[in-house]
């Protein structure tokens, strides 16, 4: 993964050159349920139940897709709290925006604007282990 910065208006962009991550991003964007989940969590952290109601997703499908997006690193558990004795996880997309540039079979470029607060949470959680 290659990272470059444009510091004028703090517009950070990441060029993703890992074939595996590119494939996962393109798959997630082409899957309608994953796409809706990423859209819903690109700006604000939300619990799964809010994502399900807001995007009108089937419960079991939504939970499976959320777990897969977390495993791929495209979604992070932003925070969790206990409500009525149950742990509720809030999710946030790792990226604020994603741009895919497809120029034939040999050149596919994926550029993304990271959600810096989501990545910061992920980093803090990693160092807490």
Residue locations for each model-derived region?
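Amphipathic alpha-helical dimerization/coiled-coil segments
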Residues: 96-129
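Short helix-to-turn junction characteristic of helix-turn-helix DNA-binding domains
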Residues: 29, 38-44
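N-terminal leader segment of winged-helix/HTH proteins
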Residues: 1-25, 72, 81-82
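Alpha-helical residues within the helix-turn-helix
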Residues: 53, 70-71
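Short, cationic-aromatic polyanion-contact patches
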Residues: 22-31, 47, 80-102
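Short acidic, hydrophobic short linear motifs in intrinsically disordered regions
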Residues: 44-54
């Amino acid at each position: 993964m290659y990272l470059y910065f444009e510091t004028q208006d703090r517009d950070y962009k990441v060029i993703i050159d890992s074939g595996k991550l590119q494939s996962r991003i393109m798959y997630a964007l082409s899957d309608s349920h994953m796409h809706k989940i990423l859209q819903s969590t690109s700006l604000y952290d939300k619990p799964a139940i809010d994502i399900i109601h807001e995007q009108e997703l089937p419960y079991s499908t939504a939970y499976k897709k959320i777990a897969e997006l977390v495993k791929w690193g495209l979604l992070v558990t932003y925070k969790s709290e206990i409500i009525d004795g149950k742990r509720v996880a809030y999710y946030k997309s790792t990226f604020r925006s994603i741009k895919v540039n497809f120029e034939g079979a040999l050149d596919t470029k994926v550029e993304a604007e990271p959600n810096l607060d989501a990545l910061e949470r992920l980093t803090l959680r990693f160092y807490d282990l």
